[in-house]
Amino acid sequence: GRIQNIVKNHNGPSGNDICEMIVSIADRLSAGDREQHKTKEDKEISSSVMQLISVFCDINLNKQNKKFEETYYKRPIKRDVLHYAEKETSPRIKEEYEKLFESLKEAFNKIYSEYGEDKFLFAHYLYHLIENYTFNIPSAYYYNRPTISLWAHLKTTAAIALALYNQLKVEYPGEGESENRIKRQLETIINKLNDSSTITENEFPYFTLIKGDISGIQDFVYDTDMDGASNALKGKSFYISFLMETIAKF
């Protein structure tokens, strides 16, 4: 179907389908935060590992020691399974990815059969399903150092695509000639991305990044009686996370 074509052509639209063009642009903008390999050896190691590198190995408190050991999330697992990063890589990573994908398909079919008729509920469950299954695997490893999860890349790609679509529909309302103008504008953006040196500041003012900072909450979190402290801390942590998600959504 159309969704399959949009996903399949996310690296480059096959024609002038608006959604394909928007997702392709969003994918490229979202991938702009990937860290390039520093050496040829790093690239060769990363291409064979295919696992997400823990960002904690980049934390260097001793400025004299520039060398750090990379640690990997050894198995691609679901979010509800606790697993720490390790120095050794998994020798059966391809098989583990296949198992994870089969489990994802099974879970997807289940939520689709239960909530497929309600688009809002289905989108809600699909969002968390994808997070659950992709938070621990790299978005790319062939050409980039795999420190960005597939979940983070997918989420920002979707956010950029939706923002771009909504903004263009406001600028060019209606159908017919308006859609043709949208296509021409998207073609211009794609051509500019192919040669980023031609992009000027504020040339495409379509996005606003809003940063939220919840600080000074230590008193709220730790002002807890010792009796039942564990449950209270979990509850307050959930409340803060839920509050941030709600503010960001609305």
Give the positions of each predicted feature.
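Regulatory and interdomain segments flanking nucleotide-handling catalytic cores
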Residues: 1-4, 11-250
